[in-house]
Structures are given as structure tokens and as C-alpha cells.
């Protein structure tokens, strides 16, 4: 039985539509190379909440909360070819999307 190679691509962004759009573009590129692909798998969304005082001096009870969510998607590519890797390297992702690649 042959050992399968895997590439895992994790996409992170504060805008869920941007993550979904670029996940589909990556999938389209990989499908052209006939590699096996799983995804996009939505990972749990993390919400970060920051609480700050409204006033710099008094009124400790008067506070304001700011929240933002980070959305993540996972794409797994099985048995990638050299052409698959070349096409993935040529993709130019926008600055709002963070990409993490593990093999």
C-alpha cells in the first residue's frame, strides 16, 4: 500500500464571505489538476470580545464592548502533483485572508 501525501490549507479571515470565496477558488484550481480534495471544512468561529471604559476617569460602570469574529476553513488535498503545487503557488490571495499550509 502506497503512502499518501497530504496538503492541509487553513484559511483565516474576519470576513466569512472572503474566506468562502477564496476557498472555492482554491478548490477550482486543484480540481483542474485532478488531485483528490476534501473541503472546504468550516472550523469553529472564534469571537473575541474587548471591554473598555467609556470614560477615562470615573464611571467604572459605564463600559463599551467591541467584538470581532475570526472565521476558518480547512481544505485537504490528497496526492498532489507538481502541477497542483505550482498552480497553488501562482494564486494571489487578498491581504484579508491568512493562509497556513502544512504537508
Swiss-Prot record:
HAMAP family: Ribosomal_uS10. Involved in the binding of tRNA to the ribosomes. Keywords: Ribonucleoprotein, Ribosomal protein. One of its GO terms (molecular function) is tRNA binding. It comes from the Bacteria. The gene is rpsJ. It holds the Pfam family Ribosomal_S10. Part of the 30S ribosomal subunit. NCBIfam families: PRK00596.1, rpsJ_bact. Gene3D superfamilies: Ribosomal protein S10 domain (3.30.70.600). GO terms for biological process: translation. This is Small ribosomal subunit protein uS10. One of its GO terms (cellular component) is ribonucleoprotein complex. The keyword Ribonucleoprotein applies. Belongs to the universal ribosomal protein uS10 family.
Amino acid at each position: 500500500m502506497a503512502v499518501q501525501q497530504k496538503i492541509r490549507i487553513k484559511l483565516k479571515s474576519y470576513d466569512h464571505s472572503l474566506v468562502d470565496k477564496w476557498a472555492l477558488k482554491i478548490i477550482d484550481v486543484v480540481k483542474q489538476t485532478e488531485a483528490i480534495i476534501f473541503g472546504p471544512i468550516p472550523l469553529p468561529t472564534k469571537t473575541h470580545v474587548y471591554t473598555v471604559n467609556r470614560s477615562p476617569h470615573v464611571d467604572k460602570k459605564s463600559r463599551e464592548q467591541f467584538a470581532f469574529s475570526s472565521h476558518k476553513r480547512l481544505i485537504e488535498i490528497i496526492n498532489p502533483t507538481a502541477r497542483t503545487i505550482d498552480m497553488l503557488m501562482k494564486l494571489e490571495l487578498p491581504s484579508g485572508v491568512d493562509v497556513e499550509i502544512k504537508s
